[in-house]
Amino acid sequence: MNHEPSLDSPNVLRRAAYSQKAPKVSGFASYLQEIEADAFAGTFLLPNWLITYHAQKHGWSRSDLTREETVYQLALRCGASYQATVWALERNNIINAATREQLLDVKPKQIKERVGHVREAAETRNDAWVLNEGDNRADLAISVGDTITVDLSQQAGAGYLWIAKKPAPASLTELDCSVSTKSDAVGAPSTRRAFYRADDQGSGQLPFEHKRPWEQHSIDEIAFNLSILKPEHGLSRANRIRQRQNRQGINAG
């Protein structure tokens, strides 16, 4: 890919032996090298089967994967960067070149703000997770400082609501909770949203049950398994996720 020599190339090692500095890359060449490296890494981090797996779990169509919010959530679950995920989608013929350019024009910071990752709640460098029915029983590796939006559809017109089955883990702080209807029609389905921030290390479960508040039994249950650790400096996000999962003895969800 015409990259400049890496630190382990023979030429650089020979220069180091004579206390000479390795050549530096700057400007557009550096930017291009970063893009190429990102795309190359995506070949290993984002094989087609992994994209298909998460798309099927969440019911994401090919059209959904042209939306930056969906691509960002896919990237989080695959442990890859947003940019690498965009390139992988094109490489696997899920999007075309024009869509790739449109997606790359959008910065992850803008996407986070759209899903509720406001500056007052968390730093923009942290991730903004949106969890729904497709993440049921999934083992999710979260970093301290990340925000979590739980987004669940409910049949409020029939009296069924998503209710927290038990308090959230102590490492999470609940910041907000809201209900919005999908239409003005009487009895229309609604969405329950709960907004959290990961403030400390820890692991635990975030469980909900779909039930009428006055009834004992639920008609459905959902739980998200969370592993929250501080970011490991010097490691890529993908390696941090794998390391956290190995420590907790969990598999990628």
Regions found by a protein language model. Give the residues of each.
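Conserved binding/catalytic microenvironments
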Residues: M1-V106, G253
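A general structural signal for short secondary-structure boundary/capping elements
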Residues: D8, A16-A22, R119-E123, Y196-A198, ...
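Residue-identity detector for glutamine
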Residues: Q20, Q33, Q56, Q73, ...
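Pan-zinc metallopeptidase signature
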Residues: R62-P167, S236-A238, I250-G253
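Extracytoplasmic soluble-region selector
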Residues: A128-G253
